[in-house]
Amino acid sequence: IINGMGKGTFMPNKTMTRAEFAAIVTRALGLAAKDTKAFTDVPSSKWYAGYIGTANSSGIVNGVGSSKFNPDGTITRQEAAAMVARAAKLCGLDTAMDAAATKDMLAQFGDYRSVASWAKKPMAFCYSVNILDQSDLNIEPTKAILRCEIAQMLYNMLSAAELI
C-alpha cells in the first residue's frame, strides 16, 4: 500500500504530498487507478494521475479550487482526517457526527478551535473511532502530516472497518 522512498528506506518522519496520499488511499481501498482529467494541474503523464482521478471520482479527495489539485502540496493533519473519513465511509463506517458530539470530541484538545470548520466533523469522527490517537494534547490541524502518521491512520481505519 505504501511504497518506500528508495534504497530500502521508508522515511517515517517525512511529510507527504497530496499526490502521494491519493495513491496510498486508493491502493489501501483496492480501487483501480483511472485518470479522470478532473484537474488542470494533474497531467495524464504523471505517475499519480490515475490515483488522483480515482480518489476524486470516489469522493475521497477534492481539489483546492479553480480546477486545481496541487499534487505536490504537503498534506495537513486536517486534510488527511477529512480524506480518511471519506475513505472510511466508502468502507462502510458510519461517519456521521452531530454538532454536539463533534464539539465534545474536539473540546478535549487545547487547540480545537483552530480546526477549520470543514474539517471539524471528519476530525471528530477520526478521533471517535481511534483512527487518530486521543492521547495527544493538541490536534495541530495545519501541521504537515508525516508518512508514519498516515500509515497508522489507514491501518486504524481498515481495522475499524474490519477489513484487516
Give residue spans per PLM region.
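Feature responds to low-complexity, polar/acidic, surface-exposed segments characteristic
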Residues: N3-A22, T26-Y51, S57-Q78, R86-A119, ...
